[in-house]
Amino acid sequence: MTYDILVSGCIALKGAQALALQHKDELVRRYGEAYIDKAIERRDPEIGIPADKGIRLIRQIAEGGINAALWQSAKELGCGLRVSLYDIPVYQDTIEICNTLDADPYTMDSDGQYIIYAENGLSTVEELKAAGFKDAALIGHTTQDKKRLIIYGEVERFLTPPERVQA
């Protein structure tokens, strides 16, 4: 059986906040204090994932970021995956902080967010949004083969095993 792959919200928030605190002066000079303060003060919703009989697996996105969570969960399920990079939600300020500091948001701590494998991804996304996870998104699906692919546009690349974790 194949499953849809969802994310409960924007990734890399915790890691980007840690970087912003460490490099606040540099970032404020580039983006302004109000912009960086907003990025630092943003919080994930502190609510539970709704119970759904069609959910196969839920994994927190922590050390190693979404890439590590995808790798580990595919290994646990014994499946491959196809994930659209463009469908993974990331706040714009997180991208800018990461670009400025040469960090990768896809390998960054996203504590508070979850990867969810569900039979009916669209229905589960709607349940998540109704429960307060406004940025929940369907990002891909599992495959019968063992290939773990990240797709962006016409380009496909293999997901690599997690190495040393970042932020």
Residue ranges and their predicted role:
Residues 117-123:
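Helix N-cap motif at beta-to-alpha junctions
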Residues 130-167:
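Acidic, Ser/Thr/Pro-rich beta/coil linker or hinge segments at domain junctions
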Residues 21-25, 71-78, 98-101, 126-135:
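Short, solvent-exposed amphipathic alpha-helical segments in soluble enzyme
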Residues 35-110:
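Active-site-proximal betaalpha loop/short-helix elements
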Residues 1-38:
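Phosphate/diphosphate-binding glycine-rich loops and adjacent basic-rich segments that engage nucleotide
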Residues 6-10, 109, 117, 140:
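Short beta-strand segments
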